[in-house]
A protein has these predicted regions:
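Bacterial Sec-dependent N-terminal signal peptides
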Residues: 1-22
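Intrinsically disordered, low-complexity regions enriched in small/polar residues
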Residues: 5-8, 33, 180
Length: 229
């Protein structure tokens, strides 16, 4: 009797079936809270890794909920921070605390953290305005410095498998003298795209950030075929 062995190695790449969420925007205070509560718990939270940022919203909610069950959020301030984190990612936490008592015009800010939203199993979207203004004075030149930003932030998921994020703003600013000197030598606003001059020593620039997010799984399949004769 003779037999031969034929081994087939098949490698396939496919979209992962598990849910996919967008990232928590990188913010110093926001991430300080998360890192602080992990340190307070005295253990490593397995849902996210503090050395790898940004965190996934889905992982964040799973992590802080596990910390809450252990009694980490003890003070009034801790409970406030816990609810804030859950409200900001309510599509995963389903926080009832995020429901507005009096929505604006019945449809706006029905959730405290969202100007507009749609929460369907096949399509999830969150839309929020971006408004920012700041001013100061240059201690060397005495000039008044300022920045004014207006725009929109959009995030969501498609079928909970593909996440997407967009941040768009129009900005006017008078920047410090050393930045303007750099722009004079190399005509570009640092880290920005399209721009033009604006009034006295100011700049007008457009800022855009976006990404899509999905998981890819790599499967290694070994098939052994035995043939007997």
């Amino acid at each position: 009797m003779r037999f031969s062995v034929f081994t087939l190695l098949a490698i396939s790449v496919s979209l992962a079936a598990q849910a996919q969420s967008t990232n928590v925007p990188v913010n110093e205070d926001y991430y300080h809270w998360i890192d602080r509560y992990e340190a307070k718990s005295g253990r490593i939270v397995p849902q996210f890794f503090t050395s790898v940022k940004p965190y996934k919203r889905q992982a964040l909610i799973a992590g802080i909920d596990s910390l809450n069950r252990e009694g980490v959020f003890t003070s009034t301030a801790d409970q406030f921070n816990y609810q804030y984190l859950r409200n900001d990612s309510w599509e995963w936490s389903r926080s009832e605390e995020n429901d507005s008592r009096q929505p604006v015009l019945k449809h706006l800010y029905k959730k405290k953290s969202d100007f507009l939203y749609s929460d369907l199993p096949e399509f999830d979207i969150h839309v929020n305005p971006v408004i920012y203004a700041g001013a100061g004075k240059d201690s060397q030149s005495g000039e008044t410095l300022y920045i004014s930003s207006r725009g929109v932030e959009i995030r969501g998921m498609i079928d909970r498998k593909v996440g997407f994020y967009t941040f768009l703003t129009d900005n006017q600013a008078r920047l410090p003298g050393y930045v303007r000197s750099g722009i004079a030598q190399n005509p570009v606003v640092p880290h920005e795209g399209f721009w033009k001059d604006f009034k006295d020593n100011g700049v007008d620039f457009f800022q855009a950030r976006a990404y899509i997010d999905f998981n890819i799984s790599i499967c290694f399949c070994f098939h052994n075929f035995l043939k007997f004769q």
